[in-house]
Curated annotation (Swiss-Prot):
Protein encoded by which gene: Mal
Residue numbers on the Cytoplasmic membrane side: 1-24, 76-92, 148-153
Family label: Belongs to the MAL family.
One of the GO BP terms on file: protein insertion into plasma membrane
Domain MARVEL intervals: 18-151
Disulfide bridges in this chain: none
Subcellular location: Membrane; Cell membrane
GO cellular component: apical plasma membrane; endoplasmic reticulum; Golgi apparatus; hinge region between urothelial plaques of apical plasma membrane; membrane raft; plasma membrane raft; Schmidt-Lanterman incisure
Phenotype caused by lack of the gene: Abnormal myelination and optic nerve morphology.
UniProtKB keywords: Cell membrane, Lipoprotein, Membrane, Transmembrane, Transmembrane helix
Subunit structure comment from the entry: Interacts with PLP1.
Keyword Magnesium: no
Protein name as catalogued: Myelin and lymphocyte protein
Species of provenance: Mus musculus (Mouse)
Length: 153
């Protein structure tokens, strides 16, 4: 299968085809798992405020930006312009890098919590680390296929 066909073509979908074309259906996974990271970080204790502050910023920023892009694609704001394909690829590359840095920092904060915190708080942070890495992987996959779409446009 050609790269353009594997990535859903060289144009962005509009309407509810956002939920049926790859890689754009990954918006839903980014939304769900990114929201879980946000909730888990917000509900946990903060042993390293600076590190977890960055994780919180990344999760909220990416949640809002992903939701905004998804809504803009559904209502067809892009109008088939190639500049939106560039925006899509750039956003997902930046989001993947941000989430990778946030995942590493959250893992560091969780490791530092091992002694002196309850298991409940420790397990919340472990879940946040796992979901942060899952979201990182989803953003990387979306970025790769967005770059393929960008190159073929």
């Amino acid at each position: 299968m050609a790269p353009a066909a594997a990535s859903g073509g060289s144009t962005l979908p509009s309407g509810f085809s956002v939920f049926t074309t790859f890689p754009d259906l990954l918006f839903v996974c980014e939304f769900v798992f990114g929201g879980l990271v946000w909730i888990l970080i917000a509900s946990s204790l903060v042993p390293l405020p600076l590190a977890q502050g960055w994780v919180m910023f990344v999760s909220v920023f990416c949640f809002v930006a992903t939701t905004s892009l998804m809504i803009l694609y559904i209502i067809g704001t892009h109008g088939g312009e190639t500049s939106w394909i560039t925006l899509d690829a750039a956003y997902h590359c930046v989001a993947a890098l941000f989430y990778l840095s946030a995942s590493v920092l959250e893992a560091l904060a969780t490791i530092s919590m091992f002694d002196g915190f309850t298991y409940k708080h420790y397990h919340e942070n472990i879940a946040a680390v796992v979901f942060a890495y899952v979201v990182t992987l989803i953003y990387v996959v979306h970025a790769v296929f967005s770059l393929i779409r960008w190159k073929s446009s």
